[in-house]
From Swiss-Prot:
Glycans are attached at residues 38, 49, 57, 75. Coiled coil: none annotated. This is Interleukin-13. Belongs to the IL-4/IL-13 family. Cytokine that plays important roles in allergic inflammation and immune response to parasite infection. Synergizes with IL2 in regulating interferon-gamma synthesis. Stimulates B-cell proliferation, and activation of eosinophils, basophils, and mast cells. Plays an important role in controlling IL33 activity by modulating the production of transmembrane and soluble forms of interleukin-1 receptor-like 1/IL1RL1. It comes from Bos taurus (Bovine). Gene3D superfamilies: 1.20.1250.10. Interacts with IL13RA2.
Length: 132
């Protein structure tokens, strides 16, 4: 019985190591959603002086893709906390000098619209995903 219990515990512990990508915790995703709501609501002036970022397909690696797109915006203090949250949710760390070829870059949109799209998609993920 003790051997069976030990085997179950080992399988549970190693199960997370074999998953294809880390699953964000519900708390981290909820904090990101709250931050995006705070940023996007009641915008009377252009966010980040109307800076433009690459529009992305947020269906795969959405946190890394969003971080990769926002990392080039350096003079906007409003999104610094969002970038830190995305950095924590992203398993690999992109840099401003390293442009990822993983994402198709064909259209630029304003940061405000990008964050609204990210908020909408994050809410969908939060509603539909099961968290540990």
């Amino acid at each position: 019985m003790a051997l069976l219990l030990t085997a179950v515990i080992v399988l549970i512990c190693f199960g997370g190591l074999t998953s294809p990508s880390p699953v964000p915790s519900a708390t981290a995703l909820k904090e990101l959603i709250e931050e995006l709501v705070n940023i996007t609501q009641n915008q009377k002036v252009p966010l980040c002086n109307g800076s433009m970022v690459w529009s992305l397909n947020l269906t795969s690696s959405m946190y890394c893709a969003a971080l990769d797109s926002l990392i080039s915006i350096s003079n906007c203090s409003v999104i610094q906390r969002t970038k830190r949250m995305l950095n924590a949710l992203c398993p690999h760390k992109p840099s401003a000098k390293q442009v990822s070829s993983e994402y198709v870059r064909d259209t630029k949109i304003e940061v405000a619209q990008f964050l609204k799209d990210l908020l909408r998609h994050s809410r969908i993920v939060f509603r539909n995903e099961r968290f540990n």
